[in-house]
């Protein structure tokens, strides 16, 4: 079984990755829930563990442009930067969800489609999930979508 809790697994996965992959749900299936939050199109959105998913691109095309995408994998971030160089408002950064480099109360919405699951597969899983949730709570001023 893959070690989803190991950052090296993700680096290797995206090194050899072709195309894109959406964990669990795509944007279209979550769109009704997101729209019920009544966020403005100018909302600041944090996409945790973006991988190479088209989720942020679909959200961008729906009018949400202020999306900060993070992932622990440099390879994933490079893929996404290359794919989205024309979407200037979106940012892509290598970052650990347990140590977010954002100011307090920065985001209106945080989206996590499976990063928490990956942390639960690693060593010190409950401690790592607690660190992630504490960091997300710190940077979030609005709603949270798991």
What positions do the PLM features span?
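N-terminal, positively charged/glycine-rich alpha-helical extensions of SAM-dependent methyltransferases
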Residues: 1-20, 24-28
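Conserved alpha-helix/loop element of class I SAM-dependent methyltransferases that forms part
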Residues: 22-41
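A generic alpha-to-beta junction signature in SAM-dependent methyltransferases
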Residues: 38-39, 84, 139-142
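Class I SAM-dependent methyltransferase SAM/SAH-binding core
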Residues: 46-99
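A short acidic, Gly/Pro-enriched loop at the edge of an enzyme's catalytic core
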Residues: 98-110
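A short SAM/SAH-binding and catalytic strip from SAM-dependent methyltransferases
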Residues: 108-126
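A short glycine-rich, Lys/Arg-flanked "PGG" loop and its adjoining helix->strand segment in the class I
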Residues: 126-142
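Conserved Class I SAM-dependent methyltransferase catalytic core
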Residues: 145-146
């Amino acid at each position: 079984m893959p070690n989803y809790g190991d950052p090296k697994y993700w680096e290797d996965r995206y090194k050899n990755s072709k195309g894109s992959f959406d964990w669990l749900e795509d944007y279209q299936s979550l769109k009704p829930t997101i729209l019920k939050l009544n966020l403005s199109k100018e909302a600041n959105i944090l996409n945790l563990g973006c991988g190479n998913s088209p989720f942020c691109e679909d959200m961008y095309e729906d009018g949400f442009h202020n999306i900060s995408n993070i992932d622990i994998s440099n390879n994933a971030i490079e893929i996404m930067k290359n794919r989205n160089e024309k979407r200037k408002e979106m940012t892509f950064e290598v970052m650990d969800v347990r140590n977010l480099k954002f100011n307090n109360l920065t985001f209106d919405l945080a989206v996590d489609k499976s990063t928490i699951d990956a942390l639960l597969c690693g060593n010190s899983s409950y401690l790592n999930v607690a660190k992630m949730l504490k960091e997300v709570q710190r940077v979030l001023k609005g709603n949270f979508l798991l």
